[in-house]
């Protein structure tokens, strides 16, 4: 019974940590990352389709992303979708592909991204605390139903807190790592 609670807490906490790391990929660092385009969809025969499912998206160098559609008529649609996404660059259509040239990041942009990373970390911590609350509620229910003793409940609460502390520390480490990556010129 208790192991199920701990395993569920661990699994959910791991998902929160993975979600944080996925969120971090949307932040621009010193070099471009194609994940910055993950949220962009294009109209593909009447259906909104993720950009990476209708084109090859490559980082050709540290400041350029090249998008080559699998079908030429999509060039204009891709160009419009990127312009509408407001990611801070203007798309350049050369007839074969759409190129995005990212200027070097300013100190202010880096600091803004650090703020966003910290906010993402806080959101992940809130998620971890909610998972802890759910686990504690499950332990409390077992104790109330006399399925476990008071001593077992105390140990279970301690274990839940230990798991919470572990994942909170992992989140702090991830944020700190991302912060140093963002501030590196």
From Swiss-Prot:
Gene3D superfamilies for the chain: 3.30.1360.40, Ribosome-recycling factor
Domain of life of the native organism: Bacteria
GO function term, MF aspect, one: ribosomal large subunit binding
Signal sequence, start to end: none
InterPro entries in the cross-refs: Ribosome_recyc_fac, Ribosome_recyc_fac_dom, RRF_sf
Gene Ontology biological-process annotations: cytoplasmic translational termination
Gene Ontology terms: cellular component: cytosol
Subcellular location, record wording: Cytoplasm
Keywords: Cytoplasm, Protein biosynthesis
Keyword Plastid: no
Primary residence: cytoplasm
Role description: Responsible for the release of ribosomes from messenger RNA at the termination of protein biosynthesis. May increase the efficiency of translation by recycling ribosomes from one round of translation to another.
Family: Belongs to the RRF family.
Protein name: Ribosome-recycling factor
Gene: frr
């Amino acid at each position: 019974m208790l192991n199920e609670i701990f395993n569920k807490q661990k699994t959910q906490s791991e998902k929160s940590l993975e979600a944080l790391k996925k969120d971090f990929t949307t932040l621009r660092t010193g070099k471009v990352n194609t994940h910055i385009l993950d949220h962009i969809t294009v109209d593909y025969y009447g259906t909104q389709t993720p950009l990476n499912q209708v084109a090859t998206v490559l980082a050709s160098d540290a400041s350029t992303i090249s998008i080559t559609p699998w079908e030429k008529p999509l060039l204009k649609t891709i160009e419009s979708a990127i312009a509408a996404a407001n990611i801070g660059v203007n798309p350049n259509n050369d007839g074969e592909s759409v190129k995005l040239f990212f200027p070097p990041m300013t100190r202010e942009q880096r600091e803004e991204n650090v703020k966003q990373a910290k906010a993402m970390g806080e959101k992940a911590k809130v998620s971890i605390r909610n998972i802890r609350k759910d686990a504690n509620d499950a332990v409390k229910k077992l104790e109330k139903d006399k399925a476990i003793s008071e001593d077992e409940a105390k140990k279970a609460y301690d274990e839940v807190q230990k798991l919470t502390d572990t994942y909170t520390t992992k989140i702090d480490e991830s944020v700190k790592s991302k912060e140093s990556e963002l501030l590196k010129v």
